[in-house]
């Protein structure tokens, strides 16, 4: 039985296979527990954070903390049911009236907080069913929106009807929706034709390994795995004793002691990673007041 890994593998997902298919291939290397943070559509490539072993338990915190950077290409003049080039064309329209200045003005307007329409072909759920299943069954899908935050929006190049752009956005932003809404505002339709995730907090493509390389060299998996402590870089690391570890494993909150965190004064809501005497992650914790006492409350245990 191969040694089980506990950490993150930053994968450079190729365009074509689904995120689940990529995860399945890595699992065949002998890893029992495996997951990922932030699905990429089959058409999209780039950074996919693969979670191994105990790291599968930090997925929600990675997603909550992390912004993402995408570079994409769109094409004016048509609309599809999926809002990308892989869908069925539902409408075409002339685009020659559109200028580069028109495109740049709309991309600039993406900045800030806004309500974004969720694509009808997506994993978002309605009454427990993913929208894509309702769409494939020919059933009407409700219009759903979500709040997204975009801190960078730029046109990389414009060779109409093709436009290359880059955005830095909050987790869960649909880039297909940005392309679709741009097409509506220009009056000609638009579809996403290519997408690369360049960054998924806290890792970029410079840290990523191709799927082919990972599968071709299974003996190097361990050296490619990033420790859990590095996945949450802004969380304080708090060392605990064997006795304290026993309490944590029983779900008992630990008394807060400032000297455990470089004499940091107590503040509610501070998240940290507890490390055992070997500096192995034991649990994710958060400062809280329980029964009038200042404590580290266990959010998630990082053990089997």
Curated annotation (Swiss-Prot):
One of its GO terms (biological process) is mRNA pseudouridine synthesis. It comes from the Bacteria. One of its GO terms (molecular function) is tRNA pseudouridine(55) synthase activity. The active site is at 41 (nucleophile). Keywords: Isomerase, tRNA processing. It catalyses: uridine(55) in tRNA = pseudouridine(55) in tRNA. PANTHER family: PSEUDOURIDYLATE SYNTHASE TRUB1 (PTHR13767:SF2), TRNA-PSEUDOURIDINE SYNTHASE (PTHR13767). Responsible for synthesis of pseudouridine from uracil-55 in the psi GC loop of transfer RNAs. This is tRNA pseudouridine synthase B.
